[in-house]
C-alpha cells in the first residue's frame, strides 16, 4: 500500500477544514427566523403583581 507524503496530508486537512468552515458559514447565514409571525401567534398574558405590604 503506498504511503501519502506529509504535504498530501496537509492539503487534505486544509481542504476538509475549509469545507467545514464554508458549510458552517452557509448554515449560519441561511437560517432565517420569522419572529413577527411567531410573536403574533403567541398570546402571552403578562400578569403584573401588585404587592401591598
Swiss-Prot record:
Q: What keyword terms does UniProt attach to this protein?
A: CF(0), Hydrogen ion transport, Ion transport, Membrane, Mitochondrion, Transmembrane, Transmembrane helix, Transport
User: Does this UniProt record's set of keywords contain Ion transport?
Assistant: yes
Q: What does this protein do?
A: Mitochondrial membrane ATP synthase (F(1)F(O) ATP synthase or Complex V) produces ATP from ADP in the presence of a proton gradient across the membrane which is generated by electron transport complexes of the respiratory chain. F-type ATPases consist of two structural domains, F(1) - containing the extramembraneous catalytic core and F(0) - containing the membrane proton channel, linked together by a central stalk and a peripheral stalk. During catalysis, ATP synthesis in the catalytic domain of F(1) is coupled via a rotary mechanism of the central stalk subunits to proton translocation.
Record carries keyword Zinc: no
Q: What is this entry's stated membrane topology?
A: Single-pass membrane protein
Q: What is this protein called?
A: ATP synthase protein 8
Q: What's a single GO CC term here?
A: mitochondrial membrane
Locations listed in the record: Mitochondrion membrane
Q: Which family does it belong to?
A: Belongs to the ATPase protein 8 family.
Q: Which gene encodes it?
A: mt:ATPase8
Q: Where are the transmembrane segments?
A: 5-25
- Gene Ontology biological process terms in this record: proton motive force-driven ATP synthesis
Main localization of the protein? mitochondrion
Which GO molecular function entries does the Swiss-Prot or TrEMBL record give? proton transmembrane transporter activity
Q: How does it assemble?
A: F-type ATPases have 2 components, CF(1) - the catalytic core - and CF(0) - the membrane proton channel.
